Amino acid sequence: KGVKVAHGEYLIFMNSGDFFYDSDVLKNISKELYNEDVLVGKVFIYGTNNIISPPPQRELSMYHLFSGSIPHQGTFIKTTLQKKYPFDEALRISSDWKFFLQTIIFDNCNIKFTNIPVAIYDNNGISSNNPSAMRFEKEHILSEYLPKRVILDYKYMKQCECLTQTLTPQLRKSYRIDKLLYIIGKLLLKINNRQ
C-alpha cells in the first residue's frame, strides 16, 4: 500500500523485526547508488555475524534465484520499478522472490551488490520458520514462468550441487583421492579446452 504513495527515488522493505545495521546506512548507501535498478547490501542475522544470502561469486543468474534468494531487507529498489512490478499480495512468503525473478531475470534489470552492511534480520519470521510453505510458493511461481522440463533440470542441478558439496570435503581427506581428483579435473579441463 505504501508503494503507491512513495515518492522517493528508492525504497526498501523490512519486516517488523528487522532494522537498519546502524544510523549511517542511508548515507553510506547513497554513495553507492549510480542509477541501478536494484542495489543489494549485506544483511546479518540478529545476534550473529552470519550474513544471509552472500553476493554471488559471478553474475546473478536464474540458478542463483532457484537455489536461494536476495535479502529484501538489504535491497534498495527503484520506486518506479516497484510500481511497475508490485509485490504479489496473494503470496504470504515469496512475493519478494517473485519480484526479483520478474525484474532481474525476465526483465533484465541491472543489479549491483555492495559490501555495505544494511540490515539486521530477525530470523523468527514466517519465512524462516516455514520452509515447506516457502518451497511450495516458489514452485508455484516457477510453474507460472517456466516449463516443467526446465524446472526439473534446475532441481537436478541443485541435487548435483548438494551432492558435490557434501562429498568433496570427505573425498579430499585422503591424499590419494585428492590427487586423483586433481588429475581428473586437469584432464577434463584439457579436453574441454580442445573443443
Give the ranges of each region predicted by the language model.
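Conserved nucleotide-sugar donor-binding catalytic segment
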Residues: 52-141
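Glycine-rich, basic loop-to-helix element that forms the pyrophosphate-binding segment
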Residues: 1-6
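Conserved donor NDP-sugar-binding/catalytic core segment of glycosyltransferases
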Residues: 19, 23-53
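Membrane-proximal basic amphipathic "stem/tether" segments
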Residues: 147-148, 153-195
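Short, high-confidence coil segments that cap the C-terminus of an alpha-helix
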Residues: 8, 34-38, 108-109
